[in-house]
Structure formats: structure tokens, C-alpha cells
Amino acid sequence: MAACSRTQVISLYRMLIKESKKFPSYNYRTYALRRVKDSFRENLHVDNPKTLDMLLNQARENLAVIRRQVSIGQMYTAQRTIVEETGVHRDL
């Protein structure tokens, strides 16, 4: 991987992680974070420039999808799950 491509990949990875953390729903947020990390880890050793360009374009498209879905999720919020509840702890 060339130095320029490496910086692009790292920047894109960080943007995907940052945007995935914005999901209001716990389930979508954890799923998106897991998928981003797994797909980058899976393609860590790709050296072919054509394959690398294809993967970068695919990641950019996924970033656009994540941004769109975060916006939709923020417009139509749902109740928080028990996993997301913080503050009051009951002793059983």
C-alpha cells in the first residue's frame, strides 16, 4: 500500500467509526461499528491497487449510507433499550 493510499484508508476508517458512533439506536450502532472493524480487518493485507480502489469506493459508498441512516434514525427516535439505560441502578 502506498503512503498516500494508507492515509486515505486510515482517514476513511476513522470517518466510518465516527459516523457509526452517531447512531441513536444501540443495536444499529454496535452492528455498524462491528461491520466496519471486521471488514477493514479482513482486507488488511490487500496489495492489489485495483482491488484496493474498489474497496475504497465501496467504503465511501458505505459512509454515505451510514450518514443517511444516522440522519433518518435521529428524525425517528425510538425508546432506549435496557442496555442503554444509565443512572438508576436497583439492588435485587
Curated annotation (Swiss-Prot):
Domain of life (superkingdom): Eukaryota
InterPro entries: Complex1_LYR_dom, Complex1_LYR_LYRM4, ISC_assembly_LYR
Cited Pfam families: Complex1_LYR
Any one annotated GO CC term: L-cysteine desulfurase complex
Organism of origin: Salmo salar
GO biological process: one example: iron-sulfur cluster assembly
PANTHER family membership: LYR MOTIF-CONTAINING PROTEIN 4, PROTEIN C6ORF149
Protein name as annotated: LYR motif-containing protein 4A
UniProt similarity note: Belongs to the complex I LYR family.
Origin organism lineage: Eukaryota, Metazoa, Chordata, Craniata, Vertebrata
